[in-house]
C-alpha cells in the first residue's frame, strides 16, 4: 500500500521555464489533505528545497542535492555526501573547457554534497574526465544541469533515509519524475510514474507514464496514484 508520494520539482511540478504549475501544487495539496505526505525530491540545493516545502505546504521530508541532503520544515538537515573529488574534476574541466560554468547555487556556496555544472559541456565529456582521472564520482544529466556526486549519493538513497523519518518503507512510496536522475528513485520505491517528456530510459522503468508533460503531467501523476491506491474514487 502506498503511504507517501515523492516528487521531483523542475519539469515535474513546473512549466518548462521552471515556474510552478498551479495544477501540480493543487494536486500536491490534495494528497496532503487526504493524509498522504509528499516529499519534494530535487537535484537543486537544500535552500531551494526548503523554501519550496514551506511555500507549497508539504509535510514530508525534502530530499535535495540529488539525495545528498535530507531536511524538514524545521530546517533540520542530514548530509549523506560531501564534495569528495568534485573540485579536482572542476579544475581539470576548466583547463580543457574554459567556458564551462558552475550553476549559480555553486557560486553562492549553497551546495554541500556535490558539484553542479551548466549544460554548456556535454555530460559525456565530464564522465570521460572522471574515468581518466579515476575519481570516485559519477555524473548525471538531469535535463537542467549536470550533477557530479559521490556514487552513493542519489535520489533512491535519499528516499530510503527520508522514509525512516516517516516510519515507512521505500516500497510504500510512489515516485514521480522526469529525468535520468530519477532512475535511482525508481529502483527503491513501490510505484513509479514518469512524466510525458521524460527520457525513454526512465519511461521504460515506469509503472505509468502520464499523457501530459511538465507540471500538468505531475498533477496527472498524483491524481493517478490517489485513484489507483484508493484515496480518491475513480
From Swiss-Prot:
Required cofactor names: Mg(2+)
EC class of the enzyme, as a word: hydrolase
Gene3D superfamilies in the record: 3.90.1070.10, HAD superfamily/HAD-like
Taxonomy, superkingdom: Archaea
Protein residues bound to substrate: 155
Example GO molecular function: magnesium ion binding
Reaction(s) catalysed by this chain's protein: 2-phosphoglycolate + H2O = glycolate + phosphate
Residues noted as binding Mg(2+) in the record, renumbered to the chain: 8, 10, 178, 182
UniProt keyword Magnesium, yes or no: yes
NCBIfam families listed in its UniProt record: Pglycolate_arch, PRK01158.1, SPP-subfamily
Protein's UniProt name: Phosphoglycolate phosphatase
Source organism of the structure: Thermococcus sibiricus (strain DSM 12597 / MM 739)
Amino acid at each position: 500500500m502506498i503511504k507517501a508520494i515523492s516528487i521531483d520539482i523542475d519539469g515535474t511540478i513546473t512549466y518548462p521555464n521552471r515556474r510552478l504549475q498551479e495544477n501540480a501544487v493543487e494536486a500536491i495539496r490534495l494528497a496532503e489533505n487526504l493524509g498522504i505526505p509528499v516529499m519534494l525530491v530535487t537535484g537543486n540545493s537544500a535552500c531551494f528545497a526548503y523554501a519550496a516545502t514551506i511555500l507549497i505546504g508539504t509535510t514530508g521530508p525534502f530530499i535535495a542535492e540529488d539525495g545528498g541532503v535530507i531536511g524538514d520544515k524545521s530546517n533540520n538537515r542530514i548530509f549523506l555526501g560531501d564534495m569528495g573529488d568534485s573540485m579536482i574534476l572542476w579544475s581539470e574541466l576548466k583547463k580543457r573547457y574554459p567556458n564551462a560554468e558552475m550553476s549559480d547555487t555553486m557560486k553562492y556556496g549553497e551546495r554541500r554534497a556535490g558539484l553542479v555544472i551548466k549544460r554548456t559541456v556535454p555530460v559525456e565529456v565530464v564522465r570521460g574526465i572522471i574515468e581518466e582521472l579515476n575519481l570516485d564520482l559519477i555524473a548525471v544529466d538531469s535535463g537542467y544541469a549536470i550533477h557530479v556526486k559521490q556514487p552513493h549519493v542519489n535520489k533512491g538513497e535519499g528516499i530510503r533515509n527520508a522514509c525512516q523519518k516517516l516510519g515507512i518503507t521505500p516500497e510504500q512510496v510512489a515516485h514521480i519524475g522526469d529525468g535520468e536522475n530519477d532512475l535511482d528513485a525508481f529502483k527503491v520505491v513501490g510505484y513509479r510514474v514518469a512524466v510525458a517528456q521524460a527520457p525513454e530510459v526512465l519511461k521504460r522503468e515506469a509503472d505509468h507514464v502520464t499523457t501530459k508533460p511538465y507540471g500538468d503531467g505531475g498533477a496527472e501523476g498524483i491524481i493517478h496514484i490517489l485513484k489507483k491506491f484508493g484515496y480518491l474514487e475513480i
